[in-house]
A protein has these predicted regions:
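Switch II (G3) loop of P-loop NTPases
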Residues: 2-12, 180-186
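Acidic, Mg2+-coordinating active-site environments of NTP-dependent enzymes
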Residues: 26-179, 204-205, 230-239, 246-254
Length: 294
């Protein structure tokens, strides 16, 4: 009855082409980050390409699900004077509102539907199995879409609280030696900054980060990798392993490895123990091979 299709893009015009195949009646951009800059040319290129979905929805009277908390997305919608919008976010103006209760380490949050016909919107409390406060936007997006298509709040809460990630995205793995935060499917400056910031705020001892190159950043690659290692140093991280050619060019005292095989050799010789370890990098760096060794 409902098809959910990801509009993947790495070059300008990709979305414009895909919407002609799919002809969406509803649409949502979850985020605009500094990803695939090699293909898009710039952050403005990212916004312009993703905005091609908005252009199609506007022309065909489609419904836009909009994150009211994301200034870039709000501005993109405002520029196009979108016809039909259902909003969500950590904002008092959103139709579906939510806020983080805790991340210890899993995200717990509350939400309410301000667009309800009831005299007072009910507040719901949801405990998830997701790592990272940044995931509240994903939760609110799912809630908003579910409500639009007639899914009850009770069904929504049950689905979100029982979802356990198993795709190397924001998942916690507990081994005999360590606790791992595995987010090794993809990485760009925006998502890496969010993951590191969340890790910094976690009130646990013995933190360690194993970070892989952020691919496809083009001419800003050196700058973005250096900015990240500088931020890690400023935030007081002591145990950081950097993996890949781009991190290898940075000026830092953190340990560097050319590839994942060198990391495996180090783990075999001296496996870290009793650490909370953040593992994040672009999929091509293959950090997803590390959890079974740690």
């Amino acid at each position: 009855e409902i098809a959910v299709v990801e509009m993947g893009a790495s070059h300008s015009g990709d979305i414009e082409k895909l919407v002609t195949y799919v002809e969406p009646t509803c649409g949502m951009i979850t985020n605009v980050g500094r990803a695939h800059l090699l293909g898009f040319g710039s952050f403005e290129g990212v916004k312009r390409t993703k905005g091609e979905l908005y252009d199609y929805l506007k022309a065909h009277d489609g419904l836009l699900f909009l994150n009211e908390s994301n200034a870039d997305l709000v501005e993109m919608a405002r520029q196009r004077e979108m016809n039909r919008i259902m909003t969500y976010g950590q904002s008092d103006d959103a139709n579906v509102q939510g806020e983080v209760s805790e991340c210890a380490p899993f995200l717990r949050f509350t939400w309410r539907n301000m667009a309800t016909t009831e005299s007072k919107a009910r507040t719901y409390d949801v405990q998830t199995h997701l790592i990272g406060a940044y995931n509240i936007d994903n939760m609110l997006a799912a809630i908003t879409i579910g409500l639009h298509f007639g899914v009850t709040p009770e069904q929504i809460n049950h689905a979100l609280s029982h979802y356990i990630p198993a795709n190397n995205r924001s998942q916690l793995e507990v081994t005999a030696k360590n606790k791992l935060i595995v987010d090794a499917y993809n990485a760009n400056p925006s998502s890496m900054a969010a993951a590191v910031e969340n890790f910094k705020l976690m009130s646990v001892e013995h933190k360690m980060a194993i970070l892989g190159d952020m691919r496809e950043l083009g001419e800003v690659s050196a700058l973005e990798h250096q900015k990240l290692v500088d931020k890690l140093a400023e935030d007081g991280f002591k145990e950081v392993w950097l993996v890949g050619e781009e991190f290898g060019k940075t000026q830092t005292a953190f340990r560097k490895f050319k590839n994942v095989d060198e990391v495996k050799a180090e783990i075999a010789a001296r496996c870290p123990e009793n650490y909370y370890i953040l593992i994040k990098g672009s999929n091509g760096i293959k950090l997803f091979e590390l959890p079974e060794l740690l």
